[in-house]
Amino acid sequence: MSDYKHTLNLPETEFPMRGDLAKREPNMLKRWYDQDLYGAIRRAKAGKPSFILHDGPPYANGSIHIGHSVNKILKDIIIKSKGLSGFDSPYVPGWDCHGLPIELKVEGMVGKPGEKVSAAEFRAECRKYAKTQIEAQKTDFIRLGVLGDWEHPYLTMDFGTEANIIRSMAKIVENGHLHKGSKPVHWCTDCGSALAEAEVEYYDKNSPSIDVRFKAVDEAGVAAKFDCAEGHTGKGPISAVIWTTTPWTLPANRGIAMHADLDYALVQVEGEHPERLILAAELVKDVMDRAGIEQFHNLGYAKGAALELLRFNHPFYSFDVPVVLGDHVTLDAGTGAVHTAPGHGQEDFVVGQKYGLEVANPVGSNGVYLPDTELFAGQHVFKANASVVEVLTERGALLHHKVFNHSYPHCWRHKTPIIFRATPQWFISMEQKGLRQRALEEIERIEQDGIKQHGQSGWVPAWGKNRIQAMVENRPDWCISRQRTWGVPISLFVHKETQELHPESVRLMHEVAKRVEQSGIQAWWDLDKAELLGSDADLYDKVPDTLDVWFDSGSTHSSVVDARPEFNGNPADMYLEGSDQHRGWFMSSLMIGVAMKDKAPYNQVLTHGFTVDGQGRKMSKSIGNVVSPQDVMNKLGADILRLWVASTDYTGEMTVSDEILKRSADAYRRIRNTARFLLANLNGFNPATDMVAPADMVVVDRWAVGRAKAVQAEIMAAFDEYNFHGVTQKLMQFCSIEMGSFYLDVIKDRQYTAKADSLARRSCQTALYHIAEAMVRWMAPIMSFTADEIWALLPGERGEFVFTEEWYDGLFGLEAGETLNDDFWAEILTVRGEVNKALEVARGEKRIGGSLQAELTLFAKPALAARLNALADELRFVLLTSKAKVVSVDAAPADAVATERDDLWLSVAQSAAAKCDRCWHHVEDVGTIAGHEEICGRCVTNVEGDGETRQFA
């Protein structure tokens, strides 16, 4: 018996079946960096149209988490796909380096500035700490396969960037957007200073709970707003009732907040002293119960919106206050009307800004009422609560009073209760130079430009526009000053007596920026005023405040994008961050861009959702559901993480768990197996000498290349629309269905058994080559490591890296006018699906083993029969049976198997012919050829003759 194995073209490749990514990816990374891959991409793309994705800087503190990974991977997918689309797309990663979290870490290590270390030493320690954090995060970002200028990232603490931040501030001052005002901050009366959110802890505390009457100025006008029955508007004075747990803030009251959409009742209280009270309709019974009022009824109702700007008398001062509307008003407790003191609460401040209410602050830094505070001067606020209650009682304004225990903010150092207190701050005004209106116009422009240029809104997903629009419409002036040590100085000089800015502030800020560019922000604190102000030095103070860190990152379009040479002066095309950044970086960048240049700093804004576990819960160490990107990379590899990111619809919450990642790993294996089949069957193929011209190729091979061409068009469009889960779906479908379930199955016989250099086999290899060239590029933005691995093993001359290439342009397909066109093969696929079902039944009934044991009869109506007969004897290769005969439907026996098609019945029989040892087909001529008794005539031709001819399959 002869052994024909050596006559077969068995697949062979160095591309392993197992990715073993966790072990092998680091070596690939090393090669990328040893060979300066990022530089190679820049050189290859030089002179192409630019696409700039500006990196929103993560904060330089702590390890990267799964959300960071999602963000960086999405950016990397876009950058790489833009490169393939013919753009020069440099990527400069950045870090946000100033601010409180780093200060707190450094305080824990060296103590507070001004205690054990000087402020200058403290800043130096902060800089050093930020550097260590950046290095750790950088290592993890690089490990994700993210390509960028990691050797030269931008840091907001680089001297040049710090200087440019000051220059950005100078431009805003020059354009007239800056003003000085007051803003409430957490204030510790023991520290005598403002506290940041992170310095506040919550403990239980006893506080007074009071309901207070504010009497209406115009009772008839107020009553008229309610839908009372005619002539039944009640009797007695009308009061709006507010509830508060901080009576000491009532001296600063400047308004009563109600909710526009809530129903309010005008309540008649009966008895010896009748009165009418305004309360939220749902809370009337609660208020009456706690006030001990039994006889009452509702006279009428009005929406909060109808009561806007009605005026009520302050309970103990001789002025009146308006009703204002705010979304912070709820029915959770109280009366539905909220005491509003803009100097003592953040929500009060925001609503107060909207209505132009005075930001009154009668309280000094030590928690004592200022000397000019009527009734309460010199009292400590917490001790004054009792005095306020006493005054309210005397004036007949107190409806109810009790003491209750609740959670209250305390200073983390002193463990003592804190207050909200308005302090002088610097603001970017939303109104004084029309900033709000221009920002809203830019939001609209971004949407419209996107539709014109890309067929979709510049806000991706489109709901992002409404979100940021609502925020801009309602946002107060931006408080940009902070009383911190580690931050970019606001760099202003103010007159000691008038508190006015120096008339040459803009020039002076540019002078400060020059010094900061040389030696960093410490230059400001080391600066002797006389150096810049000369003889005026004694008249002016240096403002000690630092800039809000959101100003640092929000001005990077100017301090980084405008400054880096690789961006060639082009503005950013895209900003891409998590959905929390509508309030954060997207907002601060928009405000600064419009304030500086009258233009948004981006053309497109892409938003991704947050990561949650498989049950939709937030990641939490206490729940134990945290998925660490480092763990995923160490176990499964970065390409699995990247495939998960791409496969997930990022427009909503992104679910991740071990089980979900396992599914990504399974999908990855299917794609890898397809790639391995392509490479293994390109063994011995040299495109320079073995390529077959399209006109000479076997028809099904041209069909397969045509399918790749169609899929490539869909994939390119999906990349352009940032629809990455669409890309992965199309790639999976192509690998699993069109290739795996059909084409790669059909060609195995020809690929393995045809003469090695025959047209039949070279045609097939030509198709596989074109498909592999296209597919490796589709994969490259997402499964970058695997694409690099495939690229290195593809035959033919090529550059070192797939990432310097563009989409493959060598694809072609069948012409629509051909008989065996795409529609023909689509029908063949449905017929094959029906045949497979019939073969499966026969296999289940033990009538056949493999499909090659089957002889198939297809009973077809004339039109289908004609199409099937177009494949002649090659129909059996398409259906993977040893024989396939097409017969008129009229000849179908009663036991023919019906199919889901109304023009096809099938009959499956076991072949009586012997099996060819080489191709495994059952053929009558096996055993009839002298010297080759074990194989069929077709195989003899392929082994000894010129090789078989294939036209169709």
Swiss-Prot record:
Q: Which residues form the signal peptide?
A: none
Database matches in InterPro entries:
aa-tRNA-synth_I_CS, aa-tRNA-synth_Ia, Anticodon_Ile_BEm, Ile-tRNA-ligase, Ile-tRNA-ligase_type1, Ile-tRNA_ligase, M/V/L/I-tRNA-synth_anticd-bd, Rossmann-like_a/b/a_fold
Chemical reaction(s) catalysed: tRNA(Ile) + L-isoleucine + ATP = L-isoleucyl-tRNA(Ile) + AMP + diphosphate
Q: Report residues binding ATP.
A: 621
Query: Which parts of the sequence form the motif 'HIGH' region?
Result: 58-68
Q: Which CDD domains match?
A: Anticodon_Ia_Ile_BEm, IleRS_core
Q: Which GO terms describe its cellular component?
A: cytosol
Required cofactor(s)? Zn(2+)
Q: Name one GO biological process term.
A: isoleucyl-tRNA aminoacylation
Residues where L-isoleucyl-5'-AMP binds:
577
Places the protein is found: Cytoplasm
Q: Which family does it belong to?
A: Belongs to the class-I aminoacyl-tRNA synthetase family. IleS type 1 subfamily.
Q: How does it assemble?
A: Monomer.
Q: What is this protein called?
A: Isoleucine--tRNA ligase
**Encoding gene (name):** ileS
